[in-house]
């Protein structure tokens, strides 16, 4: 289906467009991205679509169409209200933490969190610190979580003005689930996560990007927008799915080369 949609230049190629919006456009014979580029924003038939959303969709359609014609990716930073987009970012702090969790969904009801990765300033240098499960069992997951919480507690005791940055809601949700899961045996976990949530220390960069960045791409995944700020990854693992497959192979073979 995706190949057909791309070939037909169907309007679902625009990032974050909703089904209800697509249905409204189709009633007006707006079927392709190119059609959307030329819509009249004052058309009363589009009044059920928020005017700002309609304008943004037209702008994104122009970027998508331009890439289709030139092969070049592009983006613009849009104006937003004071409480949205880039305005949601706090003042940078040298002790800010950037966190990424990797989970294995095919284990139990809630899956298995096998990797907590942190990128942060330790006071002497910027480094990547990780907590990795050596086997697929809850004991390793528990130890990982305890080690992570103890590390974060020390960090925020030392740097109370720091924030935790993540991309999309997975990390915040997974940490909350883990803290609740182990609250009876490790209350420090739920206490710290609740405290960080109350203090609004978790900054979701996906929401920032979603509200202020309009691109020529079909989605706003981290892998997709990386092309705008870094060179292409040289590592074999490029997506969360790649990581899951590799962890699955590692569990099956216990091959340390992985």
PLM features per residue range, with description:
Residues 12, 83-88, 102-106, 150-155, ...:
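Generic recognition of flexible, low-complexity loop/linker segments
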Residues 91-147:
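Metal-dependent catalytic core segments for phosphate chemistry
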Residues 14, 23-25, 34-35, 106-109, ...:
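Short helix/loop capping segments that flank catalytic or ligand/cofactor-binding pockets
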Residues 120, 128-244:
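Conserved DEDDh/DEDDy metal-dependent 3′-5′ exonuclease domain
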Residues 1-24, 38, 43-58:
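Long, low-complexity intrinsically disordered regions
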Residues 1-8, 13, 19, 28-29, ...:
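Acidic, Mg2+-coordinating catalytic module of metal-dependent nucleases/exonucleases
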Residues 28-109:
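Long, highly charged low-complexity segments
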């Amino acid at each position: 289906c995706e190949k057909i949609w791309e070939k037909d230049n169907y309007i679902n190629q625009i990032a974050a467009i909703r089904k209800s919006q697509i249905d409204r456009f189709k009633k007006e014979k707006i079927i392709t991205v190119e059609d959307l580029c030329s819509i009249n924003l004052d058309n009363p038939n589009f009044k059920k679509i928020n005017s700002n959303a309609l304008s943004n969709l037209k702008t994104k359609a122009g970027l998508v169409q331009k890439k289709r014609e030139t092969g070049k990716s592009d983006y613009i930073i849009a104006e937003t209200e004071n409480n949205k987009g880039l305005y949601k970012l706090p003042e940078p702090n040298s002790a800010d933490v950037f966190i990424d969790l990797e989970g294995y969904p095919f284990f139990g009801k809630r899956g298995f969190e096998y990797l907590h990765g942190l990128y942060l300033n330790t006071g002497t240098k910027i480094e990547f610190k990780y907590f990795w499960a050596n086997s697929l069992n809850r004991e390793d997951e528990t130890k990982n979580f305890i080690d992570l919480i103890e590390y974060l507690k020390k960090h925020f005791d030392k740097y109370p003005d720091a924030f935790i940055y993540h991309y999309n809601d997975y990390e915040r949700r997974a940490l909350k689930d883990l803290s609740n899961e182990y609250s009876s045996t490790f209350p420090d976990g739920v206490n710290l996560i609740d405290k960080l949530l109350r203090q609004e220390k978790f900054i979701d960069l996906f929401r920032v990007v979603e509200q202020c960045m309009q691109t020529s791409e079909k989605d706003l995944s981290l892998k997709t927008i990386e092309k705008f700020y870094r060179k292409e990854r040289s590592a074999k693992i490029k997506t969360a799915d790649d990581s899951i497959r590799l962890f699955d192979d590692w569990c099956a073979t216990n091959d340390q080369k992985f």
